[in-house]
């Protein structure tokens, strides 16, 4: 009976924390105004289930309102997911992401490293607001480049070696 209780307790804990996101170290001195301008090509990510984040991201900054847009498909309809938000503490940015006016997810982006001109490494914690995954969280690391280059930059090789990044494509 004690074994059953312990196993049940471990199972409950595993389920309760399965949807938790990580809390990576944010980049010191991050400049949102330099980062949130122009296009970023997502070249690598850790999400094993889908490479849905492998898009071209269009970013902008309008007086502290940060926007990230990319191609999105829902129920066969293709359009644009528009994520808008503001900076919060510790170089984290929280967005509400909408498709055709419906909030699909809330995303917290942690900038981990960037040179602003070539590469960016960041972590996304996504909380799904609609669809079959509503209420669930998913976290993954993403590497983006200003050009569609498939190589991990030398400056990030040490930081990314244990992240199990997968090449998009």
Curated annotation (Swiss-Prot):
Keyword Disulfide bond part of the UniProt annotation: yes
Keywords associated with the record: Allergen, Disulfide bond, Secreted, Signal
Keyword Secreted part of the UniProt annotation: yes
Pfam families: Triabin (PF03973)
Signal sequence segment: 1-18
CDD domains to which the protein is assigned, alphabetical: lipocalin_LTBP1-like (cd19423)
Protein's cellular compartments: Secreted
GO biological process: symbiont-mediated perturbation of host defenses
Expression sites by tissue: Expressed in salivary glands.
Gene Ontology CC terms: extracellular region
Disulfide bonds, paired cysteine numbers: 21-125, 54-168, 83-97
Family: Belongs to the calycin superfamily. Triabin family.
Protein name, UniProt field: Procalin
């Amino acid at each position: 009976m004690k074994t059953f209780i312990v196993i049940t307790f471990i199972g409950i804990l595993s389920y309760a924390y399965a949807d938790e996101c990580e809390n990576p170290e944010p980049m010191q001195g991050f400049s949102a105004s330099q980062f949130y301008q122009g296009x970023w090509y997502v070249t690598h990510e850790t999400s094993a289930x889908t490479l849905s984040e492998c898009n071209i991201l269009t970013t902008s900054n309008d007086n502290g309102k940060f926007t990230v847009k990319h191609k999105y498909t829902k129920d066969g309809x293709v359009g644009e997911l528009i994520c808008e938000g503001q900076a919060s503490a510790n170089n984290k940015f929280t967005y509400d992401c909408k498709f055709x006016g419906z909030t699909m997810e809330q995303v917290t982006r942690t900038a981990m490293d960037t040179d602003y001109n070539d590469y960016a490494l960041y972590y996304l914690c996504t909380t799904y607001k609609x669809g079959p995954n509503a209420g669930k969280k998913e976290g993954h690391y993403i590497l983006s480049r200003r050009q569609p280059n498939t190589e991990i930059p030398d400056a990030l090789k040490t930081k990314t070696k244990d992240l199990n990044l997968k090449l998009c494509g």
